[in-house]
């Protein structure tokens, strides 16, 4: 029996009801791994949807839920929630704009026991103000960091282009990093090639940790196997099974 104070269904049409996004998250905790459930949470709370019909595998969309809404739903269930759901929601972030941003956040942010580098979960597409001089005045414009660790003032910008098309693209990417540095934010650029190569990505993770004033400790003797397992789960073709 479901608690009355935790509405679980949305009316689709006369006599037909669908599980709401928060209830979907809890229901799938019974069949998904923790990692797959976190990925689902990122998609529910993000601005993209997995779409096999799209040439890039996803499409822009409005968030279906939020970490606040899922946590509130879990609280109202009064213990009638799988422990896996309570574990997974701790690592879900609002605002991811793409599957690769989600994967980057999990690779870098998750604890070592799950195969991550343990840097802590970032804010996704966080808004920051970039200073710009206009005569004698300093003005500010809004800017969004793909991944941002606000306490350490460190950002990671993901460049989805495998190769730069022209010099203008190179200039634009360099400008993004320079603009963040002008705001006092240490920034690193990451490409698909970095993510695909274990050695290159390890270097990125250690660089990010250094900027944060952290050390990546090897907490498990099988850490390489844990990291490989996480990669397999993140980049599998059928993520919700």
Task: Locate predicted features.
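Short gly/ser-rich loop at a beta-strand->alpha-helix junction or flexible surface loop bordering the NTP-binding
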Residues: 1-81, 112, 219-241
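Surface segments flanking catalytic/ligand-binding clefts of nucleic-acid enzymes
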Residues: 60-241
